Structures are given as C-alpha cells and as structure tokens.
From Swiss-Prot:
NCBIfam families the record matches: ileS (TIGR00392)
Known partners and oligomeric status: Monomer.
EC number: 6.1.1.5
The protein, known as: Isoleucine--tRNA ligase 1
Organism: Bacillus anthracis
Length: 921
C-alpha cells in the first residue's frame, strides 16, 4: 500500500503565486460587473453616515506617489467604516481650473492670442476632462472603491453655480471687497497669488546699505544727518516714499569721520562692523517716536521720504530704519496708508519697471538691481554692497521668484469672523494633534485673502460695474449668474455682454444709460476647491455637511483645509469638517525629495505593473504616514516578502480546510482542547488590536499585528505542530476537527481584517472559504472578538508555555548544530524546569511531544537536579538526545513501536491504527 496516499495533505485551488499585475485587473472587472460601489452602498443603506470628503487632486498628468498615498489611506478608512456599522460613501473629486492647464495648452502649441477667451477656455475644459479620465483609471487600478461614475469636478456647471452662491453669501455679509493692496505677484504667471501658492527656495540677492540725507529735522535733528536703510530688493527703491522707525526703540546719531548717521542703538556694533567704521562715536540718542514726521531726501529722485512709526520694525537684522515702499510690501502699505502716502507701484504685470521709475523703465525688476545700485554709488548714497543667499518666496507652479506688488484686487476679509474661525479650529479633532496649532496660528496671523486672479481659466468673479464705476453685487445678480452658470457653464460669462448676463430689465442708479461692464478677473482656485462643502457635501443627497473627515497632505493646512474653513465659517458659521487627518510627503529610499534632476522618481504605475496594487497598498499601511515616508525598490521588496507570508498563510489555511464543512464539522468551543482555545484567545486579541488600530487610523499597527500573527502565532507555533494532526490522523479525528474549527475562524477573521488594505487578495480568498454565501467579502462586517470565559487563565498558562518552548527550541538548535540530531523529530528531550514551569507542564493534557515537535518527551526533576552538562536556559535545563527506535514511514516520528503491527511493518502503532480504521476495507 502507498502510505503517502493515506496522508491528508493540504489541497486547494487557491494559487500560491499572487501574480497581482494580471489577477488584479480581472478582479476589478468582476467588481465593475457587480457594481461593487453601489452594491456596498445599498448593503449599508440606513446605517449612520460616515463621510470622508475627498480633497480634489489637480487634473494634470499621471498620478504620483503622493496621490497614491493619499487615495489609498482614504480607501482604508472608507472600506473599514463600511464594515463596522456605517454607510461610508466616497465621492472622488477633481480640481480643474488654474494656470497649469493654461500652461499645458500653451506648451502643446495652442496659439492663445489667436482666439477668444471663450474659445481658449473650451480647450482648457477639454484638456481638463482628458486629465480627469487619465487619473480616474489610475486611481481605479489602485483598487480604490469610489463613486467613479459620479465624481465632483470643479468645472462642472452645477459646481460653479454653488461656488457663485458662496461668493454671493460672503459678499452679502460684507466679507468681499475690492482694494489696492500689495499682493504676492508672479511676473512669470502674470497674476496675483494667494499664500497657498507660494513656496520658499534659496535665492541670491544683493544686500545694500543706503544713506538717505535728512531734509527737515523738525527741531529733533540738526539736518546734516543721514538715515541708513538696509534692503535686499534694490529694485524697490524707485518706489520708496518713506522710512519706518519703531516708536519704542532708541536711535543713535553716530559720528563717523565727517558724517552723521542714524541707526537703532542696539544695532550699533553690528552695523559698525558691517560698514567697517573706525572711530565711530555716538553723539546723541533719541527715541524712535521723536523722529516721527522728520523728512529725508530720496537718494536719486527729487522727492521726500517721510519718517513714520511702525511696529513692524525689528532689530533682527538691518539698521532699525526700514525702507518703506507702500506699493511693494504689506507692512509698508499699512504704515503708508496711516500717513496718507500714495501707493506707488512702478512695476507692470510682467515685472517690468514703468515710466514711474525714470531712468530704469523697461527693465525687468531683477535686472534693475545692478543699474539702481550703480546709481546709488554715483550719487554717494551706497554705503555697502554684498550678496547673500536667503529664503525667498517663489511661484509654486513656475518655480520663479515672486514680488510684492500693489494692484487692484478682490479680497475676502476674514477679520469679521476670525474669532469664529479660531473657535472652529478648536472644535475640530486634529490628527496629528500639532495640526491644530498649525492651522490656529495661520488663521490668527493671516491677512485678507486675495481671491482674484488675472487669468482666463477659472470661475469668473460675478461682479458688474455701473457707468460711474460702482461695483454691483446683489442677491438678484448673484442668483441670476448662478442660474446661468448652472444652465450654460461659466463660459457664458465670456460669451455674452454684461447686459445679457444681468437679469431682464435690471437697472442701477449708477448707470443712467443702462450701460454695464463685467469683471474680467477670475477666482483663486483655492476658492473653487474651498467651496466643495457647499457644492458637494451640502448638495448631494448621499453626503452631509460637516464631513466626518478631511484627509490630505500636510501642505493643505495652508491650502484646502484653510480655504474650506474660511468659506464654510463665513457662510455657515461652522467648520466643514469634524476631523482633519494629514500625511507627509513621499521621499526616496535615502530620504530625498523626488525630482527629475536626481532621477529618483518612483511612479505608482510602475509598481502596479511590476508588483501589483495590493503591494503598493501594503506599503502604505506599513509606513508612519503622519511624517514624511520613504519608498524604494528595497523597501518594496521587504513589503512584497510580507505579502508573500500573508498569502501563504491564507493558502495553508484553505488547503487544510478542503474537507471541512462548517455546518457539520465545527467543534463547540467548550469541547476544544486548551491549546486550540488559546489560539482563539490569540485570534480575539488580534481582532481587538486591529480594529482599535483602524479606529485610530494607525495602519502600521494593523500591518505589524497581522504580520506578527501570521509568522509568530500561526507559522512558528500553531500551524507547525498542527500538521502532525491535520495530515496524519483520520479525517474525522476529534483533534483534527478541533484544529480545523480554529483554522476556519482564523481564516474568516483574517480575510476580513485585511480587506481594507488588501481588497484584491481578500476578495480572491473569499470564494474559496467553505460555507460563505456573500458575493464579496466587502459585503460583510469586521469580525467580532469573542471573549472566552477562561481567556485570562489560558493566556497566563500558555504564554508561559510559549516562553518555555523558546528555551526548548534553542536547545534543539544547539543539538542540530552539534550534529546530535538531524531534525527535531529525531530528538528525545528531557526537561528539568523551574518549579513554576514544572507545575504548568504537568497541567497540560495535550501531547507535549507533539507541541514540541519531537519524538519523545520526558519530564526530569527540577532544574537543580539536571545533569551538570545539561544546557540551562531561563526556565528549564534541556537534555537533547537521539530518540530510540526507528522512523515511521508515514509520520516520520522515531518510535520503538515500528512493526508492532505485522500488517504494517514500517509504521508506528498510531499510524497503523489510523490506516486500518480509515483506509483498509
């Protein structure tokens, strides 16, 4: 007889190799056929809502690792929530207006100047939709479950109409105004920028010290002194109209040879060293407040420079006398306004100096630095020129430096509701907790929000102007424009004359002739996405405002988290979110930012094509995403290894449940052996731990808990010794069915627990599980931890056994290395444990040689009675010897009972019995 045919070896069709790049698209087709998103929504209908609101990625180009990290994290949460008693809709969105799309078309050769604005905008819309389609397919490939057929897209008419309503609401409350103010201006984009659109990079700049001669000392100064200012922007000097000093600072009049200079007293030593003064002496000191209204002369123009008081003056750098150009700085503007100075801004949209800067007109601002410095030298006003490298604001899109420039812009003032904004921040749950401080400080310190842009591709600012120049924003005009946009899209603004955009028969006292103009500026894209709480959460029946969670990269504190909060509090008085979670950026394996120049860009598509979406998702779960995270081939290799371990565990469990029918073969918990119940306790601990980790968005804890359970609790212990029972005993042996009962519970629970992270794999495993009826594991709930009555006692006893077992394994390893035995089944072990461990071993009813995977087990005396040469460990001394007897052909145990049964000469007594009872007719 072929004894190998009497072994119940694992049997399953579930493939060993994942082959995810091929298998996942097939699984996604199956999901599409069963309308998985709608099916899950239907299945969870009537449950409490959990709304994670998608911050819209910008529709331009392929998705990058930051997108993948973001969307996968969101998917973990939404999938988990739908398996724990919630209805968790997920509506993806796209941000589709703005400069990058205009630039992309220009780069493709679109001749913008040869077409109308409306025609150009149509091309922008087409391009944006193409990008949405491209990204949608890539997000789907990641396995993200979403309402892909009904996303929100910021260029869609219904969305734009709601955005107009938000603007109108804010205007009605007095939060929207037009004013001339210095704003961040990008000469390369030819548009104003919001704070969220700037990034800081190092830039080399001229650092100059300039003397301004006193013209009128107002009886405080004698008139022969000179104020010294310091600046790193010489190009702004043609716009200088004043000098600011701090009212509380003490200023020194310093005599250097025949000159007298005015600087802040506490900066005397620093300035003296920088300007290489020798024999400098302070001849007089005055308080800053006394210098108010003294007048200096502009160094190269025939005009005055008024000395004013400003709290913005510091002694961190410079001289304590600050060059003030109201057209080129926020503080300068505020101080200048207070003193009635004009707002002079001799720089045009392209960053070129105008005729208001005589002698330098036609020069690009950065190119004007040199001739202006030369002019200062020529008139004897330049005291020092050096070059410094400092952090300077740049346009986040063009990566070129920006300037402060006063222009007429539309602003949203947050002053009137700053207190409510700060209260809303305090009421929100922030993860990580430092997010609260970060946004609080931003809101506390931020100025008015410049919401206008001088571009073509965006939502128009819905303002009309009367003949006398009065801006017109009324409920009537706002509602009418919103209706027009809802019906025709915002392009109608560029296709029709102002009068055709106004309500029928509209009149205004400022337009006696019935003539009107329309605003040509568009809204900042942050106003677009920042209106999504109104356009999406409030408008869609399947969602609600406030959302439970906003989850984006940490750059969104100044972006979407901020703009959404501002518009929501302005319109509703409340935050649009209950909770905010932020993640870091994706770096390469060495912790460097990814860039084309370094050539270290990792692309999601490549990972999915080579390894699969579930490997990328498993990587996301493995990292501490709240900080910056790393990815590389080596890191992915480690993750793929963990995936292999998890997959092999599933395969082993399925293979050993091939003949198990849950309805017939399940053993009641009370009838299970202790070691089996101990495994259930470990499983329940895992369920509790994993669910708690999901609840707190700690996905790395989920990853480690599942990996450890598969490798330590299952592979290294339970599954290892169980093979001797599963393969060797008869199919219906009580111990075998007991183990299968445990394996079944483990398999079902484990499949559900990994579903949010590995949905493709979980749904691949699911139909192989005996007795399941649901079409997809996604239509089930997370497993519940079942508390066994004797759980604590089991844990205490069997945890102790596991520590003792570790000692035994060490001893077997030593014996193997010393060639005492070949494999552990060749061994006979005698233990000399501590008193505590001896009592524990004596209380175990299970076959201990099976648990230790040896052929013979003996309990000697106490530890102190062990032979002198016996290796001693923490809990026991262990004597390892070669087991006596022969090796059974069927179970490989070394036994002295081989051949006792004459019919089965090569089998041990146990195997002979099993064969006779189950296989001999």
């Amino acid at each position: 007889m072929e004894y190998k045919n009497t072994l119940l070896m694992p049997k399953t069709e579930f493939p060993m190799r994942g082959n995810l790049p091929k298998r996942e698209p097939a699984m996604q087709e199956k999901w599409a056929e069963m309308n998985i998103y709608e099916t899950v929504q239907e299945h969870t209908k009537g449950r409490p809502l959990f709304v994670l609101h998608d911050g819209p990625p910008y529709a331009n180009g392929d998705i990058h690792m930051g997108h993948a990290l973001n969307k996968v994290l969101k998917d973990f949460i939404v999938r988990y929530k739908s398996m724990t008693g919630f209805c968790a809709p997920y509506v993806p969105g796209w941000d589709t207006h703005g400069l990058p799309i205009e630039q992309a078309l220009t780069n493709k050769g679109v001749k913008r100047k040869e077409m109308t604005v409306a025609e150009f905008r149509k091309l922008c819309a087409e391009y944006a939709y193409e990008q949405v389609e491209r990204q949608r397919e890539q997000f789907k490939r990641l396995g993200v479950r979403a309402d892909w057929d009904n996303p929100y897209i910021t260029l869609e008419p219904a969305y734009e109409a709601q955005q107009i309503k938000v603007f109108g609401d804010m205007a009605k409350k007095g939060y929207i105004y037009k004013g001339q103010k210095p704003v961040y201006w990008s000469p390369t984009s030819e548009s104003a920028l919001a704070e969220a659109e700037i990034e800081y990079q190092d830039k080399k700049s001229a650092s100059i010290y300039v003397a301004f001669s006193v013209k009128d000392g107002k009886n405080v100064l004698e008139g022969d002194e000179k104020y010294i200012i310091w600046t790193t922007t010489p190009w702004t000097l043609p716009a200088n109209l004043g000098i600011s000093v701090h009212p509380e600072l003490e200023y020194a009049i310093v005599k250097v040879n025949d000159e007298k200079y005015i600087i802040a007293s506490e900066l005397f030593e620093t300035v003296a060293k920088t300007l290489e003064w020798e024999n400098a002496e302070v001849v007089k000191t005055v308080k800053g407040s006394e210098l108010e209204y003294t007048v200096a002369k502009h160094p190269f123009y025939d005009r005055d420079s008024l000395v004013m008081l400003g709290d913005h003056v510091t002694t961190d750098a410079g001289t304590g006398c600050v060059h003030t150009a109201p057209g080129h700085g926020e503080d300068d503007f505020i101080v200048g306004k207070k003193y009635g100075l004009e707002v002079l801004c001799p720089v045009d949209d392209k960053g070129v100096l105008t005729e208001e800067a005589p002698g330098f007109e036609g020069l690009f601002y950065d190119k004007a630095n040199k001739p202006i410095t030369e002019k200062l030298e020529e008139v004897g006003a330049l005291l020092k020129l050096t070059f410094i490298t400092h952090s300077y604001p740049h346009d986040w899109r063009t990566k070129k430096p920006i300037i402060f420039r006063a222009t007429a812009q539309w602003f949203a003032s947050i002053e009137a509701f700053r207190k409510e904004l700060l209260e809303a921040v305090a009421e929100t749950k922030w993860v990580p907790a430092w997010g609260e401080t970060r946004l609080h400080n931003m809101v506390r310190d931020r100025g008015d929000w410049c919401i206008s842009r001088q571009r073509a591709w965006g939502v128009p600012i819905p303002v009309f102007y009367a003949e006398n120049g009065d801006p017109i924003i009324t409920d009537e005009t706002i509602n009418h424009v919103a209706d027009l946009f809802r019906e025709h899209g915002s392009n109608v603004w560029f296709e029709r004359e102002a009068k055709d955009l106004l309500p029928e028969g509209f009149t205004h006292p400022g337009s006696p002739n019935g003539e009107f103009r329309k605003e040509t500026d568009i809204m900042d894209v942050w106003f677009d996405s920042g209106s999504s709480h109104q356009a999406v959460l409030e408008e869609r029946d399947d969602l609600q405002r406030p959302a439970d969670l906003y989850l984006e990269g940490s750059d969104q504190y100044r972006g979407w988290f901020n703009s959404s909060l501002s518009t929501a509090v302005a319109v509703t008085g409340k935050a649009p979110y209950k909770g905010v979670l932020s993640h870091g950026f994706v770096l390469d394996g060495e912790g460097r930012k990814m860039s084309k120049s370094i050539g270290n860009i990792v692309v999601p598509k490549k990972i999915m094509d080579q390894l699969g979406g579930d490997i990328l998702r498993l990587w996301v779960s493995s990292v501490d995403y709240q900080s910056d995270v790393r990815i590389s081939d080596d890191i992915l290799k480690q993750v793929a290894e963990v995936y292999r371990k998890i997959r092999n565990t599933f395969r082993f469990l399925l293979g050993n449940l091939d003949d198990f029918k849950p309805s017939e073969n399940t053993v009641a918990v009370a009838e299970l052996r202790e070691v089996d119940r101990y495994m259930l306790v470990k499983l329940n601990d895992l369920i509790t731990k994993v669910k708690e980790a999901y609840e707190t968005y700690d996905f790395a804890a989920v990853y480690h808990a599942i990996h450890n359970f598969c490798t330590i609790d299952l592979s290294s212990f339970y599954l290892d010794f169980a093979k001797d029972i599963l393969y060797i005993e008869g199919a219906n042996h009580e111990d075998r069915r007991a183990i299968q009962t445990v394996l079944y519970d483990v398999l079902v629970a484990l499949t559900k627990l990994v579903t949010p992270i590995l949905p493709h794999t979980a749904d691949e495993v699911w139909p192989y599980i005996p007795g399941v009826t649901e079409e997809s594991v996604q239509l089930t709930d997370m497993p519940e931890a079942v508390q066994l009555d004797d759980a604590e006692a089991l844990k205490t006893k069997w945890d102790a056994f596991m520590t003792l077992r570790d000692d035994v394994l060490k001893a077997l390893e030593v014996a193997r290395n010393e060639k005492v035995i070949g494999k552990s089944l060749n061994a006979s072990i005698t233990l000399y444990p501590t008193a505590e461990m001896k009592a524990m071993l004596e209380s175990i009813n299970e076959d201990l040689k099976q648990l230790f995977i040896v052929s013979e087990y003996k309990l000697g005396g106490m530890m102190e009675e062990a032979p002198a040469d016996a290796p001693k460990y923490e809990h026991t001394a262990v004597v390892v010897a070669q087991a006596t007897g022969e090796t059974c052909e069927r179970c490989w145990v070394v036994s002295e009972t081989i051949g006792k049964d004459a019919e089965h000469e090569t089998l041990c007594e146990r195997c002979a019995t099993v064969v006779k009872e189950n296989y001999v007719k």
